[in-house]
Amino acid sequence: MLANALRLVSNSKKIKYDYDIQKENSVQVGPWTVYSASKKGTNEEVSVFTFDKKNLSTLLKRGSIDSNLKTNYVLELLRKDVSSLSRLRHPSLLQVVEPLEESKSSMSFVTRRIQSMLQDFIKSSNGGFSNYGSSANGKSSGNALEEVEIQKGLLQIIDGLVFLHGSAKVIHYNIRPSSVVVDAKGDWKLCGFSFSQSVESARYEFNDYDFGIPSSLQQSMDFLAPEYITHEIAGPESDVFSFGCLIYSIFNKNQSIINANNHLLSYEKEITSLNSPTFIESKNLPSENLKSLLKETLAVDPKQRASMFELERSPYFTGSAIAALRFLESFPEKLPSEKVSFMESLSKNLTTFPYRIQSQKILPTLLDHLNDQKLVPSLLPCIFEISKGLDSSIFSSKVFTAIFPIISAANSYPERVPLCIFQYMDCLKSKLPSGEFLSKIVPFIYGCFENSSLNVQTTSIQILGTLLDIIDVTTVKSSICPKLYHSFSVTNQLDVKVAILDTFNVFINQKFLDSFAIVDKLLPVLEKVKTREPTVVMGMVTVYISAGAIIPEETVHEQVIPRLWILSVSPSLSLEQYNKCMREIRSLSDAVQKSHAKKLQSKPSSVVPNRITTDPFSSQTKEATSKPSSISPNKATTNIFTSQASLSSQGVARETSSASSYRSYSQRASTPAVTAKSSFHYATPTSGLSNFNSVTPSSSASLYPPLIPSEARTPSVQPANRRVTTPVVNQNTVTSDSSNDLGGWKSLL
């Protein structure tokens, strides 16, 4: 006694110290209050079962039994329940993680995480069920239990009872909805062992129902076999009868096929009705196979009931969906080839399962086998498909942590793996926080640029255009585009080049590349392309046209349109492609032309200075503008001659001959007045005059009026830095008089 007392005291706070208990959320499982919890350090998800002894006096009502006896009786039932669960280990039984800890005020133990009792599960689904599988989006409609869920759960209870009756030699004696819990994976687990007994027990005593004790602490007559209640004869067949009552209650809002309200006389009447051959046939049940199953379990005569082994093979439990779930439960034991074949079939038929089955049963099993690299290509599609319906928080914590190592090393897997990840990129984008997506998924995309598979390369590039809603402009310009420029320059795969060009076009149209980035980075890359394959050429044409709407007009004139003409005459283009190029070029040219004309029209008009140009090869003087020149001819002549002040004496001597000739020419002039047609007539000089400085018109002289000799003007000294040549006259009409120094110019004075 002292040792037990010390043990209880020393362990009474272990659960409290080792687990974080969420007191705000709780469910009832029989007499136990159950809290969700997690183990400190490992974050293992568990449930903590607690019974508060302080409330026992409130629960126990006055009855025929002494209050202290009732209290001890109830506490012994609770201890037996936990000790039986701790001793019995089977996948279909509730698994105890921490044994019972008892103090003066409470009793507690820890199990694997559960959701609720089956009784509450049925109640929350309003007693509804569906035998039509999942809805169009793969999810169960409402809270109704799908029939395949029921089939799976019942098979799990059968497995547990087979273990109890066969290996453990134990009879449960308390099978009902409150003795079955649903765990976090949706599996049904058997509990409530307070009234269990050994098969070899000498006596099976049924205690009369005590209305002074809560019903959760007593057996329910509505779920007990008639031989046990009336004759105190029991065996495994008694559990079969209780199992039949459980099946019926699932389809009848937790109500057993017997409705005795724990009164013996009422019970006997109900059993008499049950013995009728048409009793079960009259019930509203979903299938004939289910009715046959109930007949095999609810026979009044124990000898006519089927064994648990026989129930397991009932036609009600046949079908592809339930067979797949049973295969999944034994998945670790299957051969690799069987696993691959099963997964291929499952991916095609996944939507036939209720979403609760997908998320709670199938998904955890698939995640547990991701360490098998041969199975990864078959597992990922199902994992992603199920993940579409998960909350973002659950996806991040449960699914993404399991698949991220595969995503990081995707290039080491067959191409099916990265292609599958790309296929479900929208799922990743919607479920992950944007920061986590950018830091973990975008690098995976970059890595696929260098993948050995052409499909993976092109898909990784094409996928970038779908991510612009979460990728900013800076990331595109500073991180993505440099990698695309490099890949575009080094790859010899035409499909990759076309994919990159398409991505550039998306970036431009979505305003992720500005004028500077296009002109400074993109156009030089495109200019180096030498291939003239039609797909590449047309891709480049599309990019150039899109860029032409953004970059300056001067760049369009200088770099884009010439390049488009070069590409358009590629001999590899078809007529249709060529015509398309021409349409695009004309469209761009027209747009630029209209834009430029509009700019010119918007400029303020300016006054153009009047000037007269002289054509040295024509006898006509042309006016540059419609207005007369503001410079008089005489003044213009004076300006020209004034520029000769720096002539050397030798130069002046040479020009005397030309001046004499010019005098002869001027004497023949009909009038000194300036007319619109006045001009000089120049002759070809003789060889003797070839070294003279002749006054010949130059292009710069066109800024001034024509030189008209005038006797009223005298030549003035010209600046040294300006040289004026004398006109060359015809030898046949003008002779040089070199002996007279300035005689030829005197006529001008």
UniProtKB/Swiss-Prot annotation:
PROSITE patterns assigned to the protein according to its UniProt record, in alphabetical order: PROTEIN_KINASE_DOM (PS50011)
UniProt feature, compositional bias: Low complexity: 657-670, 721-735
Name the UniProt record assigns to this protein: Protein kinase domain-containing protein ppk32
Subcellular location, record wording: Cytoplasm
Source organism superkingdom: Eukaryota
Domain Protein kinase: residue ranges: 21-317
Pfam families for the chain: Pkinase
